[in-house]
Regions:
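Non-catalytic accessory segments flanking enzymatic or RNA/DNA-binding domains
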Residues: 1-158
Length: 158
């Protein structure tokens, strides 16, 4: 008895996902420094190292370094699930951190995914994102932030 790829994915995740979307992706945080500006960029990628190289190539005046990727915490997901996690976490980040574009007038490529560190450290940022992910993973029926018990209306979750 053989199991097709579609059947296997349905059995594992309980999701009906097109085979074109059966790719594993992960989330990342890049620290970006230019003169006195320090920001971080949060997003998802199929290959974080390739994304890091592309960002460095596009933003040559910025010093860019990876400070976290989800696979280091043994977390990576199918592309549609990663996209949902990314959207929800961006929503929480907008409540917690100042958007880069709200503080500075320049518009580097990808500025919509950039946040100002403010008073927070790299570790605070990483821990906050990991905490958000943990809440999402512990509640598999969560479809939005209101479904997540500990994050509901709590912009200062750290």
């Amino acid at each position: 008895m053989t199991t097709t790829r579609k059947e296997l994915i349905t059995k594992i995740g309980g999701l009906d996902i097109p085979s074109s979307k059966l790719k594993i992706s992960e989330l990342y945080i890049f620290k970006m420094t230019k003169d006195t500006r320090i920001a971080f960029k949060f997003g998802k990628a199929l290959d974080v190292e390739s994304r890091l190289k592309a960002v460095k190539k596009d933003l040559v005046e910025w010093e860019v370094m990876q400070i976290w990727k989800s696979s280091l915490s043994y977390m990576s997901w199918l592309e549609p699930q990663t996209s949902e996690y990314e959207k929800l976490i961006h929503y929480v980040l907008k409540m917690k951190f100042t958007k880069y574009a709200d503080k500075y007038s320049d518009r580097p490529r990808g500025y919509t995914e950039m946040y100002d560190f403010g008073k927070f450290t790299e570790w605070d940022t990483r821990d906050f994102i990991e905490q958000c992910l943990q809440e999402l993973i512990q509640n598999p029926k969560a479809r939005n932030l209101q479904d997540i018990r500990n994050l509901r209306g709590n912009a200062n979750a750290i």
